[in-house]
Amino acid sequence: MITDVQLAIFSNVLGVFLFLLVVAYHYINANTGKSSIKNK
């Protein structure tokens, strides 16, 4: 079985990964939005 410590580590790693994924998505989305306005 999964211990409490293993579950806590897994949930923390998953949370950090999802947070970084959201930050990367917004960073890429913001940069492509600005460059498309400049090209018009």
Swiss-Prot record:
It holds the Pfam family Ost4. SUPFAM superfamilies: Oligosaccharyltransferase subunit ost4p (SSF103464). One of its GO terms (cellular component) is oligosaccharyltransferase complex. Residues 1-4 are lumenal. It is found in: Endoplasmic reticulum membrane. It is a single-pass type III membrane protein. Residues 26-40 are cytoplasmic. InterPro entries: Oligosaccaryltransferase, OST4, Ost4p_sf. One of its GO terms (biological process) is protein N-linked glycosylation. Keywords: Endoplasmic reticulum, Membrane, Signal-anchor, Transmembrane, Transmembrane helix. The chain crosses the membrane at residues 5-25. Subunit of the oligosaccharyl transferase (OST) complex that catalyzes the initial transfer of a defined glycan (Glc(3)Man(9)GlcNAc(2) in eukaryotes) from the lipid carrier dolichol-pyrophosphate to an asparagine residue within an Asn-X-Ser/Thr consensus motif in nascent polypeptide chains, the first step in protein N-glycosylation. N-glycosylation occurs cotranslationally and the complex associates with the Sec61 complex at the channel-forming translocon complex that mediates protein translocation across the endoplasmic reticulum (ER). All subunits are required for a maximal enzyme activity. Belongs to the OST4 family. Component of the oligosaccharyltransferase (OST) complex. PANTHER family: DOLICHYL-DIPHOSPHOOLIGOSACCHARIDE--PROTEIN GLYCOSYLTRANSFERASE SUBUNIT 4 (PTHR48164:SF1). This is Dolichyl-diphosphooligosaccharide--protein glycosyltransferase subunit 4. It comes from Drosophila mojavensis.
